[in-house]
Regions:
Chain B
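Phosphate-coordination/substrate-recognition cap region in phosphate-metabolizing enzymes
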Residues: 98
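Active-site and donor-binding regions of nucleotide-sugar-utilizing enzymes
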Residues: 14, 51-52, 56-84, 92-93, ...
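N-terminal signal-anchor transmembrane helix
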Residues: 26-50, 59
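Terminal signal-anchor or tail-anchor transmembrane helices
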Residues: 1-29
Length: 193, 272
């Protein structure tokens, strides 16, 4: 059977223990199995080891290979590629993110279905806005901690109509306005050519 | 006593308008831009300064730059060699951002299109090549768990470091050009998003321009481009609100945010 990865990232600065717990809860692990996932990889953050260890112990054996790590200085690219899969051997899986813009962008660029779960305990919660706006445009699935199994289902739907990032320019009239970063820097530099 | 107070008051009243006038002069985006003759003219070496923050800020900055230098559309493709010298500013202890900057430089500098190669043949004499980059560390404006009380002290330390790094490269000028070909001058452009370090560095650049240190204001140096975080959909960030009337360009990445009529806000499409 081909393997299929679910990669979970809780972010580097403010660890999101509730997400670690939620993806190791029995209902979610069952949902993973139901969607023929074989592997669950969790980046649990600086102080998340304890939460991770106890949740893994509580989950017991369940047919899913669970692995975790604190943080990877080399970036998450490796894990994203793993989740993207490579055709026959490894099927395309899913990324579950704490709604940090870096991981969302990585997944969108690589066109891996992504479930975005904002941390509602953070004070300045603009990440919810990002999750909502992106879910509305059907770039991501907006997931809730209470029902991640449902989000996994939605991710399968998203897989079928994954949109590409950066968004393609539509219409000629818009191109005049969208000059990209280069256009803006050129204007400021005053290059004559 | 009353006499001294009145004199002080009068002096303030007299000098305040002058100071404010000076501020409006240097803060208007229509302040003069230098005339440039070609993108890679050895007499006008360009200097780009990029500020990285931790986590999301660094990720977004590099996503935006990577998208620009790898764009398939030639009109939008940023040629990294157009910027002869690049200064990357990172906060103390943020080795991850330093690593990312290095990776980006190694990826972006060798990128060259056929067009560049052709141009190289014709314009070799006036092309100063890929130039170089440096990564500069400044003390943090505020540690994550630092009490607010000591924040002014650490912010001041950060400000002093920013001033030093902005002054690191300056040149004597001749007819508005660097006196020596290829010599690195003040940054021409400061590119940033929302970390606290960015706010302080922009403030440092405003101070230098206020006093026209080494002619930086007259020569139109240190124009500032601020890109609001892509994660800001409905409300501006604190840095954004602070800088919206100070930077030359203030870009947001969601059209609904541009409707907030704040400062120099503009929406030119998503940039990350």
């Amino acid at each position: 059977m081909a393997s299929k990865y679910c990669f979970v990232t809780v972010g580097a600065t403010a660890s999101f223990h509730d997400l670690t717990k939620a993806v190791l809860s029995p209902p979610f692990l069952q949902a993973l199995q139901a969607h023929s996932y074989t592997d669950l990889v969790i980046q649990y953050g600086n102080d998340g080891k304890q939460t991770y260890d106890s949740a893994v112990a509580a989950a017991g054996s369940n047919g899913i290979n669970i692995s975790g790590f604190e943080l990877d200085k080399a970036g998450l690219g490796r894990y994203m590629r793993q989740a993207k899969g490579s055709g026959k051997e490894v099927q395309e899986g899913v990324v579950i993110s704490h709604a940090g813009s870096g991981s969302i962008l990585d997944a969108l660029r690589a066109q891996i279905p992504i479930i975005v779960v904002p941390n509602s305990q953070l004070l300045d919660n603009h990440q919810v806005e990002l999750a909502e706006a992106l879910a509305e445009q059907e770039y991501v699935v907006h997931g809730w901690l209470e029902d991640l199994a449902k989000a996994l289902q939605d991710a399968e739907q998203l897989r079928r109509r994954q949109r590409e990032w950066p968004p393609a320019n539509s219409g000629v009239h818009r191109q005049a306005k969208e000059v990209g970063l280069r256009g803006i820097l050129d204007e400021e530099m005053g290059f004559l050519d | 006593m009353a006499f001294i107070l009145t004199t002080l008051l009068l002096l303030t009243l007299l000098t305040l308008p002058a100071l404010l006038y000076r501020l409006t002069l240097i803060l208007t985006p229509s302040r003069n831009k230098p005339l440039r003759h070609g993108r890679r003219n050895p007499n006008e070496p360009t200097h780009l300064l990029i500020i990285l923050g931790s986590g999301g800020h660094t990720a977004e900055m590099l996503a935006m730059l990577t998208r620009a230098v790898t764009s398939p559309d030639p009109a939008q493709k940023l040629n990294w060699k157009d910027y002869h010298h690049r200064t990357w500013v990172i906060s103390e202890g943020d080795s991850i951002s330093a690593e990312r900057a290095k990776e980006f430089e190694e990826m972006a500098t060798p990128l060259s299109t056929q067009e560049d190669l052709m141009a190289g043949k014709v314009k070799r004499a006036t092309d100063i090549g890929p130039g170089g980059y440096e990564i500069v560390t400044v003390p943090r404006a505020r540690e994550i768990h630092q009490p607010l009380l000591t924040a002014p002290v650490s912010s001041f330390k950060c400000l002093r470091a920013c001033r030093e790094l902005l002054m690191k490269h300056t040149t004597d000028t001749r007819d508005g050009h660097a006196a020596m070909a290829g010599e690195v001058d003040f940054p021409d452009l400061i590119l940033c998003n929302g970390p606290a370090t960015a706010t302080i560095l922009v403030l440092a650049s405003v101070l230098l321009r206020f006093f026209d240190v080494r002619g930086c204001s007259t020569r139109g140096k240190m124009r500032t481009v601020y890109v609001e975080s892509w994660a800001r959909v409905k409300r501006l960030s604190l840095s954004g609100r602070l800088l919206s009337r100070v930077v030359d360009r203030f870009l947001v990445q969601w059209p609904q945010l541009a409707k907030e009529a704040v400062g120099r806000i503009e929406y030119r499409g998503v940039l990350v």
